UniProtKB/Swiss-Prot annotation:
Name of the featured protein: Cytochrome c
Keywords from the UniProt entry: Acetylation, Electron transport, Heme, Iron, Metal-binding, Mitochondrion, Respiratory chain, Transport
Source organism: Crotalus adamanteus
Superkingdom of source: Eukaryota
Protein family: Belongs to the cytochrome c family.
An annotated Gene Ontology molecular function: metal ion binding
SUPFAM superfamilies: Cytochrome c (SSF46626)
Subcellular location field: Mitochondrion intermembrane space
One cellular component (GO) term of this entry: mitochondrial intermembrane space
Length: 105
């Protein structure tokens, strides 16, 4: 189980420039992540995704995010996300714990 507070710090430092998490939050360079868990790739309403993201067809959850966040461009070739990934499994676990909580509120 990840540490939500550590995950929040990771999000703030590495993700918050491009993403929001709150319900009704604006899309930035990347989509708002509210409702992420259980949603198919490329489905946030009002955000312009690449065909690669739309066509990946997986459902976001702990396992898919764990793999994606390690190396986004390897997991979804053609994604426009510029983030190179979190190599530390602990950091990914903490970030996922935060995202699970923050995107469900």
């Amino acid at each position: 189980m990840g540490d939500v507070e550590k995950g929040k710090k990771i999000f703030s430092m590495k993700c918050g420039t491009c993403h929001t998490v709150e319900e009704g939050g604006k899309h930035k360079t990347g989509p708002n992540l509210h409702g992420l868990f259980g949603r198919k790739t490329g489905q946030a309403v009002g955000y312009s995704y690449t065909a690669a993201n739309k066509n990946k067809g997986i459902i976001w959850g702990d396992d898919t995010l764990m793999e994606y966040l390690e190396n986004p461009k390897k997991y979804i070739p053609g994604t426009k996300m510029v983030f190179t990934g979190l190599k530390s499994k602990k950091e990914r676990t903490d970030l996922i714990a935060y995202l699970k909580e923050a995107t469900a509120k």
